[in-house]
């Protein structure tokens, strides 16, 4: 008897709590975007001239926010609806969304824009300038306006040569055309990723900024409820409000979570899969708890690593957490963290360690997986080490750091 085959057959042919898992996919664009109405209003105001007075100006818009705050899905939805409204007004408008983390070079970005326009390029290798000229001529001949969203633009800024950034942002304006057909939306996690750019580039980009704050627990609940009850991701009555409330409370920014809608939806989907694996007709609170522990397995490993740190390593980590909480961005220059570390050390009555020792702390904690580091990139002034945390900061994470600091201080006073 083939037990393995029977096991697989049973699961494949068994009942499921899901109705349509596509609705839980990160790339899915829902009908509604709860708690992003204000951002859509701001985007509409920024692009009003494109619809009412097309060609009068080239619009630039920057969208900032942490991972999972709805930046990409809201921008995609806005771009598609703006295109629909323009067509109803007999205005030829196209929208292209480019992920700069996937399309990592200027050449690949221009190729993606061409594909988004369904534009056939010659088989021979083209330079970026030649590709841009073909795109521009295509828009001119067909009287088309184009909105380009450059998602994860901060990644492009940190890796691309300065001349490529300049080309992408400024070349169209240097053509000195009368009718402005190109418009840009830049999506970044933090505005500081642009602040070190050359002034001629930075001033051109940072004009209109729209902030996407982390979601509160009540907002996450509404998002999850929309996917379950309105979009019908799950079968009727298979997911209770208590399950949604639990996930929202765990991840809500006001409750010490990350405010990340993507992780919340992933947790809900995994809870459903666990229910299916147990042949349960409903998703229970226990399924949600199991899913939550699996979604963030790094936390348990980090807890063990944190307990191995000495006092000053813990103070440095606390400095990073405090900066993250206060400024709401992911990466900080090592010098800025060191300044906060010095302040905290003095508050604890400790003599701060020297600069070289701080670098050694960063090196060791990176090897332990407690922090991530990267260089500021060629598009920035100078080069410095940027430091971030590898997981969303929870109250459990903060409490553990504070507890371990207290233990080290007590031990040092006893000895």
From Swiss-Prot:
Cross-referenced Gene3D superfamilies: 1.10.8.60, P-loop containing nucleotide triphosphate hydrolases, Winged helix-like DNA-binding domain superfamily/Winged helix DNA-binding domain
Cross-referenced Pfam families: AAA_22, Cdc6_C, Cdc6_lid
Domain of life: Archaea
BP GO annotations: DNA replication
Binding, ATP: 69-73, 215, 227
Similarity annotation: Belongs to the CDC6/cdc18 family.
Function: Involved in regulation of DNA replication.
Official protein name in the record: ORC1-type DNA replication protein 2
Organism per entry: Sulfolobus acidocaldarius (strain ATCC 33909 / DSM 639 / JCM 8929 / NBRC 15157 / NCIMB 11770)
């Amino acid at each position: 008897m083939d037990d393995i085959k029977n096991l697989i057959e049973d699961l494949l042919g068994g009942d499921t709590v899901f109705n349509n898992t596509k609705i839980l996919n990160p790339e899915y664009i829902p009908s509604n975007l709860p708690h992003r109405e204000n951002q859509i209003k701001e985007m509409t105001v920024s692009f009003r001239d494109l619809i009412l007075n097309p060609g009068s100006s080239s619009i630039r818009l920057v969208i900032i926010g942490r991972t999972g705050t709805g930046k990409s899905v809201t921008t995609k939805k806005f771009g598609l609806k703006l295109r629909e409204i323009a067509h109803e007004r007999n205005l030829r408008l196209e929208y292209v969304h480019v992920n700069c983390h996937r399309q990592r070079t200027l050449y690949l970005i221009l190729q993606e824009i061409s594909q988004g326009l369904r534009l056939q390029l010659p088989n021979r290798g083209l330079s970026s300038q030649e590709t841009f000229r073909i795109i521009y001529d295509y828009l001119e001949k067909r009287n088309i306006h184009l909105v380009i969203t450059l998602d994860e633009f901060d990644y492009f800024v940190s890796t691309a040569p300065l001349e490529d950034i300049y080309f992408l942002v400024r070349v169209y304006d240097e053509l000195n055309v009368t009718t402005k057909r190109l418009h840009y939306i830049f999506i970044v996690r933090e505005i500081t990723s642009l602040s070190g750019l050359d002034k001629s580039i930075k001033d051109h980009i940072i004009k209109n900024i729209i902030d996407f704050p982390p979601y509160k627990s009540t907002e996450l609940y509404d998002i999850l409820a929309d996917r379950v009850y309105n979009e019908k991701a799950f079968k009727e009555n298979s997911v209770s409000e208590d399950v949604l409330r639990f996930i929202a409370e765990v991840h809500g920014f006001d409750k010490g979570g990350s405010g990340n809608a993507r992780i919340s939806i992933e947790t809900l989907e995994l809870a459903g899969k666990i229910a299916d694996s147990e042949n349960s007709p409903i998703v229970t609170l226990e399924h949600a708890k199991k899913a939550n522990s699996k979604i963030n397995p790094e936390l348990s490993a980090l807890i063990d690593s944190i307990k191995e740190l000495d006092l000053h390593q813990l103070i440095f980590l606390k400095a990073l957490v405090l900066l993250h909480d206060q400024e709401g961005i992911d990466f900080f220059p090592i010098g800025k963290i060191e300044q906060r570390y010095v302040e905290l050390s003095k508050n604890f009555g400790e003599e701060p360690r020297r600069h070289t020792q701080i670098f050694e702390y960063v090196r060791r904690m990176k090897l332990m997986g407690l922090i991530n580091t990267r260089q500021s990139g060629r598009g920035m002034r100078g080069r410095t080490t940027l430091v971030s945390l590898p997981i969303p900061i929870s109250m459990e994470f903060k409490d553990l750091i504070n507890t371990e600091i207290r233990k080290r201080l007590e031990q040092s006073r006893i000895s």
